[in-house]
Amino acid sequence: MKFNLIIEQLDELIQSHSLTTNPDCNPDITQLAPLDEALSGHLSFIEGDKFASMIAKTNASALILPLNETLQTQATQQGIAWIATANPRLLFAHTIRLFYQPFRPSPGIHPTAVIDPDAQLGENVSIGANVVIQAGVKLGNEVCIHPNVVIYPGVTLGDRTILHGNCTIHERTVIGADCVIHSGAVIGSEGFGFVPTAEGWFKTEQSGITVLEDGVEVGCNSTIDRPAVGETRVKRNTKIDNLTHIAHGCQIGENCAFAAQVGLAGGVKVGNRVILAGQVGVANQAKIGDGAIASAQTGIPNDVAAGEIVSGSPCVPNKLYLKVSAIYKRLPEMYQALKQIQKQLEKNS
């Protein structure tokens, strides 16, 4: 595909991003590639000035650049076609869609699927091999269900939602439109509810509901539990990575992003636009305010204020954590120095 044709197809996005181009270069682009692996015919991107030195080393035929005249001049001198925008990563993400579309089977129902007569199917649905759809299930239009998915009674799926292979959607679950549930995920499973008695643990039945609003994405082998009463809710456009657990009764805001192996205990409330990096753990009933960020492996035992950045376990403000970490590396030497001071004090006393 000619580079100028790529620009034309991105025209609507370009107009909204104050984009500039190098009109004198129009190479054939055959694929996209990382900057350090790109060859002739490849398109890559540079997100910030720190990668400027790589322009001289890359073999890419075209680059998506930030709005930086120095980088643009450098690319031109290298004979590299370029397009510059305020958000190179976003433009690159849109460009990928010109070269790649995820696999989606044609509408139809595989003959091995087991569908209860009481289930309601929308138009142009795709249902793969060995899928089980139980009574009272409602599927919206253009829903895509890959092989070996099990959907319990009464579940609702919104338009264009995709369930990848081997997912399980339990009863009392509502999933909105344009959601993606990746392979092995379990949505609406029983929350961990047991009451201690003299005889042992007494099971609390989980009669609540689980709601995923429109645009939610759940990664492979992640689990979202339903509560004993009330609801577990993940709000619009939140993205959840692989191997993440959201316990019963959690309330997750809009446009959050949780990386792999995040674990939320029961009743946690998370605001909008919260970012939790890998292996963050959040204790029971903790509240996290809008826009907060927790770095990898942070342990959150209590509430976190809106906009706060926290690190460590138990968590502290990130700036304090960095100072403590710098001191931590010097503790052996500091300990030896302290021992010498103690000896000197004892000698002088």
UniProtKB/Swiss-Prot annotation:
<dbReference type="GO" id="GO:0016410">
    <property type="term" value="F:N-acyltransferase activity"/>
</dbReference>
<comment type="function">
    <text>Catalyzes the N-acylation of UDP-3-O-acylglucosamine using 3-hydroxyacyl-ACP as the acyl donor. Is involved in the biosynthesis of lipid A, a phosphorylated glycolipid that anchors the lipopolysaccharide to the outer membrane of the cell.</text>
</comment>
<dbReference type="Pfam" id="PF00132">
    <property type="entry name" value="Hexapep"/>
</dbReference>
<comment type="similarity">
    <text>Belongs to the transferase hexapeptide repeat family. LpxD subfamily.</text>
</comment>
<dbReference type="Pfam" id="PF04613">
    <property type="entry name" value="LpxD"/>
</dbReference>
<feature type="active site" description="Proton acceptor">
    <location>
        <position position="248"/>
    </location>
</feature>
<keyword id="KW-0444">Lipid biosynthesis</keyword>
<comment type="pathway">
    <text>Bacterial outer membrane biogenesis; LPS lipid A biosynthesis.</text>
</comment>
<keyword id="KW-0012">Acyltransferase</keyword>
<dbReference type="GO" id="GO:0009245">
    <property type="term" value="P:lipid A biosynthetic process"/>
</dbReference>
<dbReference type="InterPro" id="IPR001451">
    <property type="entry name" value="Hexapep"/>
</dbReference>
<dbReference type="GO" id="GO:0043886">
    <property type="term" value="F:structural constituent of carboxysome shell"/>
</dbReference>
<dbReference type="InterPro" id="IPR007691">
    <property type="entry name" value="LpxD"/>
</dbReference>
<dbReference type="GO" id="GO:0016020">
    <property type="term" value="C:membrane"/>
</dbReference>
<keyword id="KW-0441">Lipid A biosynthesis</keyword>
<dbReference type="InterPro" id="IPR020573">
    <property type="entry name" value="UDP_GlcNAc_AcTrfase_non-rep"/>
</dbReference>
<keyword id="KW-0677">Repeat</keyword>
<dbReference type="InterPro" id="IPR011004">
    <property type="entry name" value="Trimer_LpxA-like_sf"/>
</dbReference>
<protein>
    <recommendedName>
        <fullName>UDP-3-O-acylglucosamine N-acyltransferase</fullName>
        <ecNumber>2.3.1.191</ecNumber>
    </recommendedName>
</protein>
<dbReference type="GO" id="GO:0031470">
    <property type="term" value="C:carboxysome"/>
</dbReference>
<keyword id="KW-0808">Transferase</keyword>
<keyword id="KW-0443">Lipid metabolism</keyword>
<comment type="subunit">
    <text>Homotrimer.</text>
</comment>
